[in-house]
């Protein structure tokens, strides 16, 4: 723990943590979907690897989601609206909005969630593990 003065009072907070994606374990969820996760107390980030044709079935969660496409393209459906998000583009999905996605090509995306996805950390995410 590190202690510092903030607004006239002493505050303690954990030491920062440093990661390298290459050192993170890749979790295989299905034949077409894998991920690496880094989680803090209030936010988390995941590299998600989707093979062309991979399907993320419709689901929703408490977390606000920001998806940044590093390689490839995903077709999302949110509230009946279809949008293709490609390399270099970002999609923000508000909390509790049902959404699904299909990988139009081999894709690597960076998903940021706040608050953290406890279902992912507990591996209680069957909707992904049974995905195509």
Language-model features: where?
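Short, conserved beta-strand element in jelly-roll/cupin
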Residues: 49-51, 61-76
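Short strand-coil-strand connectors
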Residues: 41, 77-81, 104
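Short acidic-glycine-tyrosine-enriched beta hairpin
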Residues: 80-95
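Ligand-binding loop in jelly-roll beta-barrel domains
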Residues: 95-119
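A short, N-terminal "cap"/entry segment at the start of jelly-roll beta-barrel domains
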Residues: 2-42, 46, 125-132
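A cytosolic small-molecule/anion-sensing beta-strand core signal
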Residues: 70-71, 86-87, 105
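Short histidine-centered beta-strand/loop micro-motifs
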Residues: 36-37, 48-49, 56-61, 102
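Anionic, Ser/Thr-rich low-complexity intrinsically disordered regions
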Residues: 46, 76-78, 110, 118-122
């Amino acid at each position: 723990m590190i202690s510092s003065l903030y607004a006239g009072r002493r505050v303690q907070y954990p030491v920062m943590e440093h990661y390298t994606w290459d050192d993170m374990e890749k979790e295989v969820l299905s034949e077409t979907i894998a991920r690496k996760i880094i989680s803090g107390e209030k936010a988390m980030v995941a590299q998600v690897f989707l093979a062309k044709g991979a399907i993320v079935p419709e689901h929703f969660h408490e977390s606000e989601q920001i998806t940044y496409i590093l390689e490839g393209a995903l077709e999302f459906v949110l509230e009946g609206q279809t949008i293709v998000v490609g390399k270099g583009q970002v999609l923000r999905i508000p909390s509790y909005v049902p959404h699904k996605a299909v990988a139009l090509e081999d894709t690597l995306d960076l998903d940021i969630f706040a608050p953290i996805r406890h279902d992912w950390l507990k591996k209680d995410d069957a909707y992904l593990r049974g995905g195509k």
